[in-house]
Every structure is written in C-alpha cells, then in structure tokens.
Amino acid sequence: MSSENKEQHDLSPRDLPEEAFGFPSELPLETQRRSGTDLRQSETGHGRRAFRRIHMELREKPDTDIKQFVIRELQKSCQCSAAKVRDGAFDFFPVLRWLPKYDLKKNILGDVMSGLIVGILLVPQSIAYSLLAGQEPIYGLYTSFFASIIYFLFGTSRHISVGIFGILCLMIGEVVDRELHKACPDTDATSSSIAVFSSGCVVVNHTLDGLCDKSCYAIKIGSTVTFMAGVYQVAMGFFQVGFVSVYLSDALLSGFVTGASFTILTSQAKYLLGLSLPRSHGVGSVITTWIHIFRNIRNTNICDLITSLLCLLVLVPSKELNEHFKDKLKAPIPVELIVVVAATLASHFGKLNGNYNSSIAGHIPTGFMPPKAPDWSLIPNVAVDAIAISIIGFAITVSLSEMFAKKHGYTVKANQEMYAIGFCNIIPSFFHCITTSAALAKTLVKESTGCQTQLSAIVTALVLLLVLLVIAPLFYSLQKCVLGVITIVNLRGALLKFRDLPKMWRLSRMDTVIWFVTMLSSALLSTEIGLLVGVCFSMFCVILRTQKPKNSLLGLEEESETFESISTYKNLRSKSGIKVFRFIAPLYYINKECFKSALYKKALNPVLVKAAWKKAAKRKLKEEMVTFRGDPDEVSMQLSHDPLEVHTIVIDCSAIQFLDTAGIHTLKEVRRDYEAVGIQVLLAQCNPSVRDSLARGEYCKKEEETLLFYSLSEAVAFAEDSQNQKGVCVVNGLSLSGD
C-alpha cells in the first residue's frame, strides 16, 4: 500500500472533507447545504442563536376510490390494439422475442455442446429419480423431455436447466406411497399382480385390459399431484403473489435441501443393499427406515452390495476430479452414463438377475403413451401436498433464474418464471409426468459448457427423444442399486453444506440456527413438516430480532453535522441538556416495552424523577411541618425546583419503518411522562408513513406539529433556541421557569 493510500485509509471522520458526509435529512443536496448553514449557531445582537425551520409541502394524494380504481384498471385491461396483442404474446412466449434475433455464428456451438452434455447427464438421473418418486423409469425420461421443451417456450432465463429434481421426486414419492397404502393396505405384491381401483385393490395372476396395476395407479397419483402443483404456480403468477418466496430464506432453503437429502439417502440405502423393504410413512420415517434396514441386514444381496461399492469407488473420485479440473475441461466427463452403460453390460452378460436375484430396472417401453388426464377423484387427497411441492419448485426456479441472470448481466421476470414452471407441470401432467423445477447442479454444468440461450434445451430434448424412441429398452438389465448410487452421489452438494457452517456462523448466528432447525426437522420428522417448521421458525426469528433491537444515544460530529452512536464512534460530542436517541426497528406492540425501557435507561427516567420529587416533598413537609393546599402531585412539583440536566429528548425515527396503534400509544405515553417533569420530546427524521400514522393517531394537535422535524440538526437547533430564550424552557406552548 502506498503512503498516499495509507494516509487516506487512516483518516478519521473529523479529517474527511465535509462533502463525504450526507446530511441526515432526506432533502436535496442544495437544500441540505442551505439548511446546514441556516441551522449552524450564529450570534444575534442579543446573543441568541438564530433558528430557521424547514418547511416541506405535501404532494396531493392520488384518488384512492376503490370503485374508480377498478373501473380504470378494467378499462385499461379491455383496451385492445395490434401492438398490445403483440406485446402480450411476446411477454407470454418470451421465445418470440429472442429467437428471431438468434446469433447463429456466436451461440450455436455453445448451445449444442451444453445441450448434449446436459442431455447425457439427464438420462441416468431421470431413470434414477423416477425410482425415488415411486415411478417406472420411463416416466422420469418423459418428465425431463417435456419440461425442456415447455421451458424453452415460456422461460426468461437463458441458463437454467429445468427437469426432474431429486427433492421434489422424494416429496412426490411420499404422496404416492401413502395413497398406494390407502388403496392397498393389506398387500405388498408387485406391480404386475395388483389391480388398483378407486375403492381398493385386488390380486390377480396377470394384468388384465382395463385394469390399473400398481405402476399405473402410481403415475396417476404422481401426475395428479403435478397438475395441482402447476395450477398453484400459475395461480401465484396470475395473482402476483410471488412474495411468498421471500419467506424461504437462503438459510431455510439450504437447510431444507440438506435435511431432505438425508431422507433421499435413507430411501436409496435399501437398493444399495439389495433389500426389499416397504417405504416408511409419516413422522420419523427416516428413523423407522434405518430400523428396518438393520433388522434385515442379514438379507443383504451380496451382488448388489459389491456393485454399489464399485460404482461408489468410480463415481465419487470422478465427481471430485470433474469439480477440481472444471476450469481446464471443456466439458465434464459423463461418468454417470459410462457407469450406467458398463453396469448394464455387466448385468446383461453376467445374468446377475437370474443368477444372483439382483433387482433390475426391467422393461422400459419405447415411444410415447397416449395422453391421459389426471385422476380428478384424487385431487382432494393430494391438494394440500401439492402446495408445499409447488412452493419449493418455484422458489428454487426463481432464485436460480435471478442468480444466473445477475451473474451474466441480463434480467428475468419472476412472474413469468412462475408461469413457465407452472406450465412445465400442468401440460406434462397429461403425458404421464411428475413435478419439475430447475436444478443447481445441471444448471452449473449447462453454464460451464458454453450455454448462451435456451436453444440448448431443445438439444437436450432431442437427446432424450433419441433415448425414448430407440435406446430405452437397452437399459432392461440395469441394476437398481446402480441407480441408487447415482442418486446418492448427486447429493454431494447438499451434504457438503456442513463445510459452510463455520463461515455461516461468523456471518449470522441466527441464520445458522435457522439452517439447523430446518435441516433437523426435515430429516427427522418429514419434508413437509420440516418446511413448515423452517418457515415458522424463520418468522419467529424475525420477530425476535425486532423484539430486542439495537438502540443508542447519538452524538454530533461537528464538522459534518452528522449524528452517530456514541457507543460506536469516538470523538462525538453530546449537546448540553439534549439527549438524542435512536431506535433501530419498527415500533409496534412486540417491542414497545423495549423501546420505552431503553429510552428511560439511556436518557433519563421521568417516572423515577417524579417519584423522587414526591418523596423529597413529603420529607420536606415532615421536616418543616409546612401545610400546603392543593393536589399532592402539585405540591411535589412546587417543592422541587432543582433543575434537571436534561431539558429535551430528541427521538431519531429514521430507522423506525412503521408504527402500529401500540407504538403510537407508547410515544404518547413517553411524551406525557417527560412533560410531567418539564422535558420536551421532539421527533426527527420520520418517514412519510410514520408521519401519517402519527397524524391519524392524533399524536399532536395542529398547533403542535412543530414537534416533528425533518432532520436531527433542525430538532437540536430548535431545542437550543427554545432553551436560550431568557432561561425559559418552552414545552408545547407552556413556559416552565427555572427560578
């Protein structure tokens, strides 16, 4: 560091030029300078300080008549023109804006490369995650295929990859298992031996035409949940209630994903060991599942266990190498696909299913099944479950969209993103698909391999189409334990969040506690309950932060006329007889007592002063045996003429965002207590909302509006000016003589 830079770095606030400090009011710069000059102390002929009040004229409020507002909005909405229709179409289908302007030479190579890589990664992941959702492998491929095409049409992000997502598959799987258990409570037969009806199920020797087996009923449940989640997401976009996502903080989402990852890991452990276990339901399913696993550990399939260990030994180091050399590799090595191909060949030629009873994926049909509407009769059963799924889906999608848009210097429309992800669920639900959302891991791969636009999603869809039409049956011999390993290895990112905890603790202890509470409740209770607990606990933490907020007395840095905390900064001077108090939170029913006690403790407690005056008066009466007429309180005041060190309390309201009824009553009470002992209370830097609340709450009369000031300097100057008027302190027009 050069000596010049070091010298600037070591400057104290007093040494900095005056322009470096902002005037504490919300006035334009010229007004601030003029006001600062007017408010500086100057001596008149009588030795008194000149004081000039700042006046601001309120703008006229717009007409708030609800009827007229509705009529205006309806008229605006019903106006139709060619330009408005075109803009509406372009807004609803963003692809119409950017596709005609597509730069083929600049973008095509990166889009094709990223689309191919993501498509190759999606094939094994789609098959693996479909098992997590309790579905056949083909439905996972359908889901990723349709989601890629639909987001291409409706999405505004250039980089995110939308498709099948592990956390949502877990939540879908829990609903599917619950509904299957309701329909078939007394049987654990395979899908080929169960015919499921709305009223229950029966065991049959073979699949009959017109009957819905376990697999068929499972996708009915999954597609119905997906349809409802999409409806919720589109409705939230239509009513512009995306603000719901603000209650899902980064710490909460991270903790939820990590906790759900433990549930996913637990659900896949049985595949790694080759155990045939029913999925546990309800609260504490993770613990119950591990109890079942350890009780049946002696039944472990050695072939599946060895295959799982070999796959782990290949996938984990390969993932680490991909991460370590991602800057040097033009594209990540598709290790998952290599493992799937190798494992399929080994299983097929080694006849692992026949010789060692290893569980395999089984028949995967080619082509597309005829579209079919969701089962409307299931909507009452799954409507509540779809709420949590829809919120998680759109929150992750919108946050990833905004993150990558900010990184690459463009904008996304959060409302349109909700439409996009909603239609990615509604439309595919008629084509035997499950819920989708954006996924961080695939989005990072997509970005790092040169993606420029969502044309890469079409390339990804073509790769999946090739698999659906030609390659899918070749995965017949693929062991389910391999798919379980792929699912678990892809949880690395979420499970490694534990490494970030020390840094998170240093940044915010409250966020760390939120992370832990959400993670533990999601893992040990259930994903839905964990999300609800996380949201409720986060809101409780917000309330807790405002219940005991920071507050301080302020001092003046004279050269800049800036007021700051005396406990934080050095070389600040307090004005004689004036206490400036700052409260950093909204003033409402939760923290009103905290505000009052902090002010009385740091400035002066008028209740104790008044009590001391009464006590002194009574003692003096006893000593001198003097008889007074009148009220005892008046007697106390008349006998106590010792001047107080404080004559004015200035409350800095700049950090008070709003007041409620309790807050207004508290300010009135504080003002009444201080005026009872001859101290005036002034409010400074109130925002328009607070001023409006004070006016509606009748904090002061029309002639008492002089108690509200636009800046601290103005309030302090007024206090000094009123005190200097021949030693008389003026309180709301009442003079209290000091002799």
Swiss-Prot record:
Domain STAS: 568-719
Glycosylation sites: 205, 357
Principal subcellular localization: membrane
Transport recorded as keyword: yes
Top-rank lineage group of the source organism: Eukaryota
Free-text tissue specificity from the UniProt record: Distributed mainly in the thymus, testis and osteoblastic cells. Highly expressed in the bone, cartilage, kidney and colon.
Subcellular location: Cell membrane; Apical cell membrane
Pfam families for the chain: STAS (PF01740), Sulfate_transp (PF00916)
Residue positions where Phosphoserine is found in the record: 12
Reaction equations catalysed: oxalate(in) + sulfate(out) = oxalate(out) + sulfate(in); sulfate(out) + 2 chloride(in) = sulfate(in) + 2 chloride(out); oxalate(out) + 2 chloride(in) = oxalate(in) + 2 chloride(out); bromide(in) + chloride(out) = bromide(out) + chloride(in)
Region (Disordered) residue spans: 1-47
Post-translational modifications reported in the UniProt record: N-glycosylated.
Biased composition (Basic and acidic residues): 1-17, 31-46
InterPro entries in UniProt: S04_transporter_CS, SLC26A/SulP_dom, SLC26A/SulP_fam, STAS_dom, STAS_dom_sf
Function: Sulfate transporter which mediates sulfate uptake into chondrocytes in order to maintain adequate sulfation of proteoglycans which is needed for cartilage development. Mediates electroneutral anion exchange of sulfate ions for oxalate ions, sulfate and oxalate ions for chloride and/or hydroxyl ions and chloride ions for bromide, iodide and nitrate ions.
Entry-linked PANTHER family: SULFATE TRANSPORTER (PTHR11814)
Entry protein name: Sulfate transporter
